[in-house]
Amino acid sequence: MAYPFQMGLQDATSPIMEELLHFHDHTLMIVFLISSLVLYIISLMLTTKLTHTSTMDAQEVETIWTILPAIILILIALPSLRILYMMDEINNPSLTVKTMGHQWYWSYEYTDYEDLSFDSYMIPTQELKPGELRLLEVDNRVVLPMELTIRMLISSEDVLHSWAVPSLGLKTDAIPGRLNQTTLMAMRPGLYYGQCSEICGSNHSFMPIVLELVPLSHFEKWSASLL
């Protein structure tokens, strides 16, 4: 969950988000080292006579500034590719939920059940109860079992949308006529908030997403009460 004046990313709730946080720290450290090196060279140029205006050929330097960036790019690309393949890998999901984007609400269908579907609208500010979050609460939450692999099928009925839940490391485009898929697995119970992350019209800011992750026994009771 995000909070005011937050400087970092949201706490990771899924294995994918933990990997993304590690990759973020890894890349940020590389950027910090490069920036420090550049600032050090600039300071030397300003404070000493570190100039080579008459140099016509420097093969050693050219070799270094060719090989060193290549090594840095490899150090960034390899962990990035690993995470990309992890995000695309879906093996034997325990549950499949189909998500459809509309202007300006979400609809959900639990495809493993015969008749379990609903629409999810934002609760207007004037109808919020004490303690509820402005522009983030919905009338129907998406209840899911924790510690299980869940496949999300995402599409749109009208324009481009994007289904995003930051604490789970999820962001998948909802494209009309195309069915995208992603996977999630939450390690802790709780409420996880997200929003539409693709500008989709005048009420784009009013398309929140709320996932309620509960133990499997609670999920079975909830689904049985709706069937």
UniProtKB/Swiss-Prot annotation:
> Cofactors per UniProt?
Cu cation
State the name under which the record lists this protein. Answer: Cytochrome c oxidase subunit 2
Query: What family classification does the UniProt entry report for this protein?
Result: Belongs to the cytochrome c oxidase subunit 2 family.
Organism of derivation: Ailurus fulgens (Himalayan red panda)
* Location(s), subcellular: Mitochondrion inner membrane
Which EC main class describes this enzyme?
Answer: translocase
Q: Where are the transmembrane segments?
A: 15-45, 60-87
Which one of the record's GO molecular function terms can you name? copper ion binding
